[in-house]
Amino acid sequence: MYHGNAHRRFGRTHEHRKAMFANMCQALIKHEQIVTTLPKAKDLRPVVEKLVTLGKRGDLHARRQAIAQIKDVALVGKLFAVLGPRYKERHGGYTRVLKAGFRYGDNAPMAVIEFVDRDVDAKGKDSGPVFGADQDEAALAS
C-alpha cells in the first residue's frame, strides 16, 4: 500500500532528489521562470515558497538556513535583497504553475513554474558559462 507517502520519489535517492530541488530552486531564483515536468513543478513549489518566506524574514538565521538549502551565496543575496522585499505584503502564493503541453520525446506533461510578480528581464540573464568569453574580453581590452 502507498499510504503516508507525502512526496514523489522521481526514481531517485533522497540525496539526489534534494540536490535536484536545490538546483531547480537556484534556477528559479536566478531566472524567475523555468520549464520542467508538471510533477517536478508541483513538488518544487512548496520548497521555493519556504525559501521566499525565509527571504521575507531577513534575519541572519534565515539567511543561513537559505544558504544550507541552495548553497549559492549570490542567489541567497538576490533572495533576500530582491524577492523578500517584493513579496513583503503577500502572504504565500509567490509562485504559479502553468501547464505547457507535452514533451516531444516521451509525451511527459510539461509545466512552467514562475514567480507571480516576476521580473521579465531576469529570464535568460546570465544563463551559464560562456566559453571563450575570456578571449573576447582580452581582445576588446587591447
Swiss-Prot record:
Q: Does the keyword Ribosomal protein apply?
A: yes
Q: Which GO terms describe its cellular component?
A: cytosolic large ribosomal subunit
Taken from the record, one Pfam family name reads Ribosomal_L17
**What does the record give under GO molecular function?**
structural constituent of ribosome
Q: Which PROSITE patterns does the annotation name?
A: RIBOSOMAL_L17 (PS01167)
UniProt keyword annotation of Iron present: no
Please list the GO biological process terms of this entry.
translation
> Which residue windows are transmembrane per the record?
none
Q: Which UniProt keywords apply?
A: Ribonucleoprotein, Ribosomal protein
Its domain of life reads Bacteria
Q: How does it assemble?
A: Part of the 50S ribosomal subunit. Contacts protein L32.
Q: What is this protein called?
A: Large ribosomal subunit protein bL17
Query: Which species does this protein come from?
Result: Methylocella silvestris (strain DSM 15510 / CIP 108128 / LMG 27833 / NCIMB 13906 / BL2)
Task: Please state the gene responsible for encoding this protein.
Answer: rplQ
